[in-house]
Amino acid sequence: MEKIIGLMSRDDWVYTGLLLFSFAASCYVRKLGNNILASGALGFAMALFIIGPRIAYSLGICAIAVGIQAFAPKKKVPFYVFLTTFTYLMFVRFAHYFLPVVEVASHTNVIQLIITLRIIGITFEENDAWLHKNDENATKRYLTRMPTLLEKFAYFYHFCGLFTGPYYTYQMLLDSQNPALQSWDPTPEVTSRFVRLLWSVPAFVITNHYFPLDSLRSDAIWEVSFFTRLVYAALIFVVFKTRVYSAWAIAESICVILGIGIYPAASNPKIIVGPTDLKVFEGLRDKENVEMNSDAIVNLDIPKVEFSDGFRDGMKAWNRSVQTWLALYVHSRVKFMRVETTMLVSAIWHGTYAGYFMSFGVVAMCAILEDVIFKLVPVNPETGLRPQWFRILYTHTIRCRGFEMLATGFLLKNASDVHHFWSSIYYWLPLLCVPFYIYSVKTAAPKLKLVV
């Protein structure tokens, strides 16, 4: 028994228990009619059981956000909520340094992260619906019904995705109440995800056992060759990916069972946006025996994560719900340095560790590096691809080795640990990116101003 327990960390075992319990609960909740308030109460009870009094951290920002939504000027509500929520997130993470409170870490931090996304997301949903309430020919789908106070708190603490993600909108939660979904069979969708577990779980357990992250923190890393260090970083990345592949296979299955993110395939649903062909959706939404899919909740595109040609495609395929959240509520709404601002918000959201900022800061430069290189090696108009020699060379050097290095920074977290390992591989990726980034900034076309 001790050997079995030793295969994973305590946190991993807790997450496994939470996921399995949530999966069983989702089956039961579906049979009872998929009630939102009951699911919110269950999620709150689970959070209270796992983190105890530390649930006060998330309750605090929920109450503050609801107050802002109720009393702030309508047009300014999203800005106030966004700013307040992230300021609060930073405050509670540092509060234990100067107040007699427990640190926001582990499961408490994860709950805080998910609720942060939900608070800001529902605020934008409400505001967009209010701004476009008189649009008769809307080309985009807006919130169909404003939530009550209890429904908001139920959404914030809904057990589905509360501990692992994926993120989903309040409108997606409302859509899951469609009676037509009660007759839809989720078995094929769930089965396809459980097939993934047949290879992702063994791969995680084996690599996690034989290639511990602490090896990168030890001085022994300096005693092996540069090539060996790169290989070890690649194996650490395998541990990280297979852990996430496994967790999200179950997390997505929970969403599927509850009908979250399930739409008619013909309506062309997109991740967290839902159906994009609104005419088709309106015609099929209440019909039974219609082909459905879960594209709106698929959080990973594993083939692209593993085999895409570049950084941008690889990043977009990873944690797609959060990537889309960042695109909708950050990238599309800022006026300058969009990639850099988006990566900064992503780093702040993940935590206060230097490793997050180091990794996400380099990601922004990697995107610029890739743009410059791709311009130098254009796509063949006949094949739609770049030369095969270039794709092989770029993928297996900058792209793959780069992602592996960035993953070590994300996992090691502390500045000293990240520096310890990154210096052993000579900071090769940032040093490669910086000249290209400077070149891109210097040669950026200035915006023309129209003088009247």
Swiss-Prot record:
Pfam family, one: MBOAT
Similarity comment: Belongs to the membrane-bound acyltransferase family.
Keyword presence, Transmembrane helix: yes
Function: Acyltransferase which mediates the conversion of lysophosphatidylinositol (1-acylglycerophosphatidylinositol or LPI) into phosphatidylinositol (1,2-diacyl-sn-glycero-3-phosphoinositol or PI) (LPIAT activity). Prefers arachidonoyl-CoA or eicosapentaenoic acid (EPA) as the acyl donor. Prefers sn-2-LPI rather than sn-1-LPI as the acyl acceptor. Lysophospholipid acyltransferases (LPLATs) catalyze the reacylation step of the phospholipid remodeling pathway also known as the Lands cycle.
GO CC terms, sorted: intracellular membrane-bounded organelle; membrane; mitochondria-associated endoplasmic reticulum membrane contact site
Enzyme Commission number: 2.3.1.-, 2.3.1.n4
Reaction(s) the record says it catalyses: a 1-acyl-sn-glycero-3-phospho-(1D-myo-inositol) + an acyl-CoA = a 1,2-diacyl-sn-glycero-3-phospho-(1D-myo-inositol) + CoA; a fatty acyl-[ACP] + a 1-acyl-sn-glycero-3-phosphate = a 1,2-diacyl-sn-glycero-3-phosphate + holo-[ACP]
Membrane spanning residue stretches: 4-24, 53-73, 79-99, 104-124, 153-173, 220-240, 244-264, 354-374, 421-441
Entry-linked PANTHER family: LYSOPHOSPHOLIPID ACYLTRANSFERASE 7, PORCUPINE
Membrane topology: Multi-pass membrane protein
Residues bearing attached sugar chains per UniProt: N137, N319, N414
Native source species: Caenorhabditis briggsae
Broadest EC class assigned to this enzyme: transferase
Name this protein carries in UniProt: Membrane-bound acylglycerophosphatidylinositol O-acyltransferase mboa-7
Subcellular location: Membrane
Gene field: mboa-7
InterPro entries on file: LPLAT_7/PORCN-like, MBOAT_fam
Catalytic residue list: H350
Keyword Amino-acid biosynthesis: no
